[in-house]
């Protein structure tokens, strides 16, 4: 028997994703809870407007999506619990920069460098 759970974000589990972006000349990291595929060549990242990382993403229109593993769980959790406004998170992970200067977590088994096409504001 099916059960109606109402309006719910129920597409779980999702991979553990840390977004990286340059903010004020330094890498910043943010644990992201909502990431989706919207086409064969497009993904969507959902970030609350107040996040410090948004400054860098809006400025450069580039970010990295780093799918991290269990060994990085504590650091990933920290990246989502502490704002870059309050703490320099640039050295939280070992990282490399791509040709455009986008920070990527060196140990992440999967990393994607993305360019922002559109930004949608929600209420």
What do the PLM-derived regions correspond to, one by one?
Residues 1-31, 36-123:
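Active-site-proximal mixed secondary-structure blocks
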């Amino acid at each position: 028997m099916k059960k109606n759970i109402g309006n719910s974000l129920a597409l779980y589990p999702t991979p553990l994703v840390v977004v990286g972006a340059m903010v004020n000349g330094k890498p910043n990291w943010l644990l992201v809870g909502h990431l989706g595929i919207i086409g064969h060549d497009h993904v969507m990242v959902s970030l609350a407007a107040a996040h410090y990382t948004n400054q860098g993403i809006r400025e450069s229109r580039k970010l990295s999506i780093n799918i991290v593993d269990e060994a990085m769980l504590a650091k990933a959790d920290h990246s989502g619990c502490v704002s870059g406004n309050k703490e320099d998170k640039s050295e939280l992970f070992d990282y490399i920069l791509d040709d455009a200067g986008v920070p990527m977590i060196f140990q992440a088994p999967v990393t994607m460098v993305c360019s922002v096409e559109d930004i949608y504001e929600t209420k």
